[in-house]
Regions:
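Sequence-level detector for tyrosine residue identity
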Residues: 2, 12, 58, 89, ...
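An N-terminal structural lobe/cap that precedes and organizes the functional/catalytic core
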Residues: 1-84
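Short, well-structured alpha-helical interface segments that form or flank functional binding sites
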Residues: 26, 61, 99, 179-183
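Internal, well-ordered alpha/beta segment that forms a basic, Gly-enriched binding/recognition surface
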Residues: 46-134
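C-terminal, charged low-complexity interaction regions
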Residues: 129-317
Length: 317
């Protein structure tokens, strides 16, 4: 099991997915695929701020990958996602969740890898990095799950993710994405589709939001509605108070992964109490383009602003 978080080795002379370290067989690939920039009509010069406050252009962010792994496994996945994205919701909604999980997970982990590489370079050593053991475990597990791209990993009767793919009313929605690294939560919108994903929750967020997901089934969401749905996922991912644990069973060429019961010895619910005021602060951030204030959002503390006819909000504490 390759786990760079055990040694904090995020160098660019080894594959970021497999850990193979042979300079002659490494390829540098863009973190944001060229096909995605092309579809989004972006030049690659657009800038993004990393956690260390440095400003980088999209095109300057690259990742080292084993050439054969890239050609045999990653490129076919990229081509599958590219084809679906080019069509829009009709095809994106048909993608296997496993493929979306690997693609989104690679995208998100790519930022983590680049961030860690930059941080260690700046410090000159990994000794000064301050990362909790729970976060190290979460990231290490996520990286291991991504090895499903090129090895036979089997999730035994569970999915480690919650992924929602929704249709957007605006068929020409510009490409944008956001993420929360600590909770491995990701969302993006593009053309006529939106995706919200929690990558290590064993499907609990999908269950937590099942009422609103059922309510919007078959409906195209407005831009405000998609941001509201995203805000709910980001907030509930924050409230999720378990660190999933797994049993790994190698058997010949296959590795079986079993999820340990989330409840364990704990009696308390899997999610901390939903607080409308805190949720309102999250929603305010997601609704910035429309200028709604926190006061407007929680004017009625019992019924926060919602763009859904039937809000289906979780019960607040």
């Amino acid at each position: 099991m390759y786990n760079p978080f055990l040694t904090f080795d995020f160098s660019y002379n080894k594959c970021f997915l497999s850990g193979k370290a042979t300079n002659t067989s490494l390829t540098q690939i863009p973190l944001l695929p060229k096909w995605l920039l092309k579809q989004a009509e972006l030049s690659g010069d657009e800038q993004i701020k990393l956690l260390d406050e440095s400003i980088r252009s999209y095109s300057s962010l690259e990742l080292p990958i084993d050439t054969s792994l890239n050609n045999e496994f990653l490129t076919p996945l990229e081509q599958k996602i590219e084809k679906a994205f080019s069509t829009g919701y009709a095809e994106v909604s048909k993608l296997e969740e496993n493929d979306l999980f690997i693609w989104i997970g690679k995208f998100l982990y790519g930022f983590v890898y680049a961030e860690m590489n930059a941080a260690i370079k700046a410090e000159g050593t990994a000794a000064g990095l301050n990362m909790s053991q729970s976060l190290i475990k979460r990231f290490g597990t996520h990286q291991f799950f991504l090895q499903k791209l090129y090895s036979d990993l089997v999730f035994e009767n569970f999915k480690p993710w919650s992924i929602a793919v929704v249709e957007l009313a605006d068929k020409n929605t510009p490409f944008s994405f956001r993420d929360e690294i600590n909770t491995l939560t990701f969302s993006m919108k593009f053309k006529d589709f939106g995706i919200v994903a929690c990558l290590q929750d064993n499907g609990t967020n999908a269950i937590f939001h099942q009422e609103i997901l059922k309510e919007i089934e078959g409906k195209a969401l407005s831009a405000e509605q998609f941001e509201e749905l995203s805000a709910r996922y980001y907030y509930s991912a924050y409230l999720f108070n378990r660190l999933p644990d797994y049993t790994i069973v190698p058997l010949k060429e296959t590795t079986f992964i079993e999820n340990m019961p989330l409840r364990g010895a704990f009696d308390k619910p899997l999610f901390d109490v939903w607080q409308n005021k805190v949720y309102g602060q999250v929603l305010e951030n997601f609704l910035k383009p429309w200028g709604f204030t926190l006061f407007e959002i929680i004017k009625d503390p019992e019924k926060p602003m919602s763009f859904f006819e039937n809000p289906c909000l979780p019960t607040a504490g």
